[in-house]
Structure formats: structure tokens, C-alpha cells
Amino acid sequence: MALWRLSVLCGAREGRALFLRTPVVRPALVSAFLQDRPAQGWCGTQHIHLSPSHHSGSKAASLHWTGERVVSVLLLGLIPAAYLNPCSAMDYSLAATLTLHSHWGIGQVVTDYVHGDAVQKAAKTGLLVLSAFTFAGLCYFNYHDVGICKAVAMLWKL
């Protein structure tokens, strides 16, 4: 009954439901040709914007993505190198790359799942504080204790 009322309000004839006469999903090839043209909506027209936003093609985003990949590849080589040659240079390199890798990864989770400007800004500020304390704590551990590499080796001996 509710669908019939809705279809009558939106102009469907003889009780036909609106979704039966209007395709909801269009193939990608058809949608590509219909960019920024009005499409029939529930009650009138709505604009479908399939083109990417103006900010998504920025150079900064591309460099950030490249930086994330470089850090990930560095970690693939740095972890075995730290196992084979544990020293303070490896400890500090691990502290920096692990903190940066974690910061960027959790930052993407915040961007994807935290909604609202104020809440997202607070979450990103909290993440920045957490990352700073993580890096400072790892550096403190490297300077005043055995370091990351030897600590992991000691854990493996247990």
C-alpha cells in the first residue's frame, strides 16, 4: 500500500510502483555517457555526478600515496635487515617507519569511518598525539634500554 501511495505521489500511472519503471542501476558504459545529466529520481530529477572530484587528482595526494608505498616497501627490507644486523641505526629506523606506517594506516581508518567535521578533527588530533607519543616512546626505549631489535630477539628466546 505504501509503495502504491509513493508511486501515485511521484507520477506513476495505474498503481505501478516507481521502481518498476525506472532503472535504478545502470551499466558502467551507459553511466559514463550520462555524466552530469539529470536522471529521473523519486519525484523529479536529480543530478548524478560520476566524474571524480576536483581535489582527488592533486599532486599532494599522489605524493602521499607514493610515500605510503615507499614506506611499506622499506619495511619489507628493513625488518629482515634488523634481524640480521641489530644495531641502533636499525632500531631508530624501525621506530620511524613503524610509527609512520601505523599513523598513515590508522589515519585512513579515521577518514573512512569517523563522520562529522568536529569528531573527525578530534580523532585526527588524537591520532597525531598518539603517533608522537609512540615515536617518542620507541626512541626512549632505544636510547635507555636494549632497543627494538634486541627486545624482539629476547621475546623470541622465551
Swiss-Prot record:
Subunit (UniProt): Component of complex II composed of four subunits: the flavoprotein (FP) SDHA, iron-sulfur protein (IP) SDHB, and a cytochrome b560 composed of SDHC and SDHD.
Keyword tRNA processing (UniProt): no
Keywords annotated in UniProt: Electron transport, Heme, Iron, Membrane, Metal-binding, Mitochondrion, Mitochondrion inner membrane, Transit peptide, Transmembrane, Transmembrane helix, Transport, Tricarboxylic acid cycle
Binding-site list for a ubiquinone: 113
Membrane association type: Multi-pass membrane protein
Annotated positions binding heme b: 101
Subcellular location, principal: mitochondrion
Function per UniProt: Membrane-anchoring subunit of succinate dehydrogenase (SDH) that is involved in complex II of the mitochondrial electron transport chain and is responsible for transferring electrons from succinate to ubiquinone (coenzyme Q). SDH also oxidizes malate to the non-canonical enol form of oxaloacetate, enol-oxaloacetate. Enol-oxaloacetate, which is a potent inhibitor of the succinate dehydrogenase activity, is further isomerized into keto-oxaloacetate.
Transmembrane intervals: 63-84, 90-110, 120-141
Mitochondrial intermembrane face of the membrane: 85-89, 142-158
Pathway(s) of this molecule: Carbohydrate metabolism; tricarboxylic acid cycle
SUPFAM superfamilies from the UniProt entry: Fumarate reductase respiratory complex transmembrane subunits
Gene3D superfamilies: Fumarate reductase/succinate dehydrogenase, transmembrane subunit
Protein's name according to its UniProt entry: Succinate dehydrogenase [ubiquinone] cytochrome b small subunit, mitochondrial
